[in-house]
Amino acid sequence: MKNLSSRRYTLKGTLALAATLIAGPCLAAAHAADYHLLNVSYDPTRELYSDINQAFPAFWSKTNSGDSVVVTSSHGGSGAQARSVLEGAPADVVTLGLAYDIDILAQNGLLATDWQKRLPHNSTPYTSTIVFLVRKGNPKNIHDWPDLIRDGIQVVTPNPKTSGGARWNYLAAWGWALHQPGGTEQSATTYLKALFAHVPVLDTGARGATNSFVQRGLGDVLIAWEDEALLASRDLGPDKFDIVVPPLTILAEPPVATVDRNVQEHGTEAVSRAYLDFLFSPEGQRIGARHYFRPVDPAIQAETAAVFPHTTTFDVASLGGWTRLQKAHFSDGGVFDQIYSH
């Protein structure tokens, strides 16, 4: 149909064109597609991706009129979610808590090993950081990492073997200890051992840990994603909790990727890529900011600057990178297994 104006028509061609025009609406309907995408995500993104999933179909239809898109999301601890995809969960996209969990999928052939180069900011549409959520009025006077190991303080944090957020929490504490004057891996290990002696129970995911703290009343302080702490404070009332941003903490970078093997099987490559592109769009960035994820778009950062307090951060690369850290700390027999005796 695009090149009709350049053709010379015979009577036969004219009749064929007429038939095509009459059938046009039927052909257009036949070419419309129904897409069903599965986003396998980590624990504290339920509300974020509920809104993203509702907004994305309109974004897709701007250039794909007539298509229908339904996106569903699955949530849990990031490590456990990655394992579910390895075991056959039909994810079109993964939006996990840390790059290592997606690297595992790449190492097993589910997507390309250079997946982080496909999208801006190492395929990270939003960032966060690690903060402390405390009871209103901060009755235990918790302001910084050393306060967490004082006598009588109970700390709530999830299990770093199953939760991406827990690994960020752990590494925030580890990195803080390393950055202290004279800090060494030995002194950081000593601090982590003292910290986890104050943890009465390990939930499997960040949302479970939040529920233990805010609903069950367990503990004096929750180590949490900034977005999770802000969400809890907003939804349960600022009269119940305060947020403490430690002077030094970690830059948390939760990345996203298409699962190449699955989207090729499902025929959803283009729509899955567009879904991830939407996260970087101004609309997607604003949705992220509404759910307290720090945007990466400078314009949206400027719009939302008042929401996010300034803090000094270090990143995972400065600690040696995920591959080294995973092996040293979170593999069987690693530092975490050595220090956690419960």
Question: Which sequence ranges carry the predicted segments?
Answer:
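N-terminal export leaders
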Residues: 7-14
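C-terminal segment of classical bacterial N-terminal signal peptides
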Residues: 21-30
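N-terminal segment of the mature folded domain
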Residues: 32-162, 305, 340
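Short beta-strand->loop
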Residues: 40-42, 134-136, 154-181, 195-199, ...
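Periplasmic-binding protein-like
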Residues: 124-129, 191-196, 203-204, 236-269, ...
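Short helix-loop capping/hinge motifs at secondary-structure junctions, enriched
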Residues: 137-143, 162, 175-183, 262-270
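Ligand-binding pocket segment of bilobal, Venus flytrap-like solute-binding proteins
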Residues: 180-247
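Extracellular/periplasmic juxtamembrane helices and adjacent flexible linkers that interface
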Residues: 263-342
